[in-house]
Amino acid sequence: MKHTYFYDTLQWTAEGTYYAEEEKSFPLHGEVSILHSETEWSLTGFLEVRFTGEPVRFTNDYVIKDTDKQNTLSWESFNPALGTLKGTFEIVGDSIISFYQSEDGVYMGTETLTQAAEKKYYNAGVSFCRGQKMSSWTAIITADDQGR
């Protein structure tokens, strides 16, 4: 099965659980749009976590580019809370594995998307601040057929 995340222009929705540093869990909801141009791809999205009351929204805008390495994509994103993040997406079988770090080296993390079906991925990730676990999450990400 070929990967559809990144490679197809689709709208994606995520539903799952966000874990704060003390492992307290909260529901999460996210949406992602992926667009392609001749030189790069863009991934724009948000993640909402319902800690208490109104959800807190985290936004990210990624620029994704091919590299000279097979099965490796580079990316850069600006996150209002963390600053500029740079990383790679490594395509490994049915999984897409990402490692990232902030420009100042304070924040880093990893995330894995494992393809379950053509338009469905399982997602798990963890982020760190100065080497200490900051948060983690699990989610199911599905494509919206209306996004085509």
Regions found by a protein language model. Name each.
Residues 8-10:
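A glycine-anchored, Pro-Gly-centered beta-turn/N-cap motif
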Residues 2-3, 14-112:
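Central antiparallel beta-sheet cores of small beta-barrel/beta-sandwich binding domains
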Residues 110-148:
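Edge beta-strand at a domain terminus
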Residues 5-6, 121:
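Generic hydrophobic-segment detector
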Residues 1-3, 147-148:
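Short, Lys/Arg-enriched, disordered terminal segments
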